[in-house]
Amino acid sequence: MKHINWNTEKNVKLKESRGIGFEDIVFYIEKGDILNDCLHPNQKRYPEQRIMVIGINNYAYLVPYVEDVEEIFLKTIIPSRKATDIYFGGENES
């Protein structure tokens, strides 16, 4: 598996604002909780960028990334209600 990297400052901001960091994402990737992996829908603005959908505790997180021959670089972590409905059938709704 390729080395997974990220911006340290971005990681701190994500932990503070969203309660999840890139280390958590790597854990779930290694655990096999990738629900989908596709090209970013806006290739004009984000060329060569892909998005992993990671399932964590019945919730879907979108993780945009770029990959080269040496590494996978994670860009951000986006909790997604819409993806959760798609991949978990709205299980989180009370």
Language model features with spans:
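Ribonuclease/tRNase effector modules and their secretory precursors
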Residues: 1-94
